[in-house]
């Protein structure tokens, strides 16, 4: 075979190469986002392994409600706060279910409700909230009578505020240890702003509907009852509800108002349903 033929044969058999295909920008962003989440998860695991349990729990609780960075997410204009889908409110009904824990799935519950305890402010209470499938939501644990002295379960903010003004109040179908709990309604996404508190005695034995009228909720801001002559004072009429919280606290309506039906230690409350009602 001639040299030319050998040369032609060599070049003919040499595989051709093409420039590597570029990954679409959207795909690259997804991969980068996934990698960032993995790195963030590893960092959080390391952080939790060295933090005392109360501080680790506080970090997780703040991130559940405020997003990555916890409280720092509040000052980040690009941070997206986790929310949940608001219930559809139908006009003309005698009641409006907000949360039915008897029919809620575990995934729904985990994406909508979380524990929020006094360890976010240096306390030592240790409580959790769980869903007993087909039965109820349970808030249980231990409270300590130092620092904050509270434990709670709270919903994530609704993705839009709901108007319950045509109703008379909110009822909590519950049972438990007989202590004095309180329901808190939020009308803003700022936890340092005014929120509306109302205390109630938790029934023992069987589930009962505890009715809490909007007119009886009191405005509280940062652990202090807001007085009528103050600029922050406003009443609760149910026209704007953004989140709901159920709490056991050593205080009733502010830090100068002790809860006389509270004792530190073990506690539990079971909740079947939270709904708006008309008399």
Regions found by a protein language model. Name each.
Residues 36-279:
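Beta-rich carbohydrate-recognition modules and glycan-binding surfaces
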Residues 1-29, 40:
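N-terminal chloroplast transit peptides
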